Each structure stands twice: as structure tokens, then as C-alpha cells.
A protein has these predicted regions:
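Conserved S-adenosyl-L-methionine
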Residues: 48-144
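Non-catalytic, mostly N-terminal accessory regions of nucleic-acid modification and defense proteins
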Residues: 1-70, 139-143
Length: 144
């Protein structure tokens, strides 16, 4: 992330952005992640990043057909913004939420289950941020 360019040059605007993020953080990671994905969708719709984004309803349908569990390893070899991985994480949290109360299961969920790779370094950063906003602390990511 050393090559990241910070484009908010106005100190007052930066302060407002940070305050807004802190307010969102108090509402939970799920809301922040949803907002992040919404903004990514707006970028894709305007052609800003040139990446293909699978529509949310298609992702949801595919994950529901897969029915992922805490015993699975979830891997997306062309992860982009990590939409598929995050939908799988959401499915697991909704269907095995009680099992996530166990510390070992929680650690596995946050650090071991989710794997992804992409050939675009910017998309890797976007996907990583998306995962972290959705409570996946140490995603297993590989730049290819």
C-alpha cells in the first residue's frame, strides 16, 4: 500500500470524512461494508475502474446454491472487490451465527476461511478493504 495516493487535500474535508467514518463505525461493520460496496458499484457504473462487477442478485443466488459453512475454504481466483467472498461470509454469519460465538470458530472465520487473488493491485486493495469492513481481519490474499 506504499504506492497509495491520498487525494483529499483539504484538511477540513478530510476531518469531515474521518468523522463520518467514525460515526459509521459505531453502527457496525456491516453498514460500513454495505456503503463501501455501494460506492464501488457507482464507480463501476460510471466506468471509473473498468472492472466487471457481477450483479448482487447473481452473487446471492450462487452463494445460496453453494451453502458455504465454517468447515469450507472459500476461494475466488479473480476476486475484484471481493463481492463473492463477502456474500459467502454474510451467508455463514447468518446461518451459523451461534457457532461464531466459539472463539476458535470466530478466529477461523476472521483469519482462515476466505482466500482470494487478483491480477490488479488496486482491486486487491479494494477487495481487502471490503473484507476488513465486513469483519474479516486477515484475509488470505495473493496478487497474481
Amino acid at each position: 500500500m506504499e504506492d497509495t495516493v491520498f487525494q483529499i487535500t483539504n484538511a477540513r474535508l478530510l476531518s469531515r470524512v474521518v468523522e463520518g467514518i467514525e460515526e459509521l463505525a459505531s453502527d457496525g461493520a456491516d453498514m460500513m461494508g454495505d456503503i463501501y460496496e455501494y460506492m464501488l458499484g457507482k464507480m463501476a457504473a460510471s466506468g471509473t475502474n473498468g472492472q466487471f462487477r457481477t450483479p448482487r442478485h447473481i452473487i446471492r443466488m450462487m452463494v445460496e446454491l453453494m451453502r458455504p459453512t465454517l468447515d469450507d475454504i472459500i476461494c475466488d481466483p479473480a476476486m475484484g472487490s471481493a463481492g463473492f467472498i463477502m456474500e459467502a461470509a454474510k451467508y455463514i454469519a447468518e446461518h451459523q451465527g451461534d457457532e461464531l460465538l466459539n472463539i476458535d470458530n470466530r478466529n477461523r472465520y476472521r483469519n482462515e476461511i476466505f482466500h482470494g487473488s487478483d491480477s490488479d493491485a488496486s482491486m486487491m486493495r479494494i477487495g481487502c478493504m471490503n473484507m476488513m469492513l465486513h469483519d474479516v481481519d486477515e484475509p488470505q490474499l495473493h496478487y497474481r
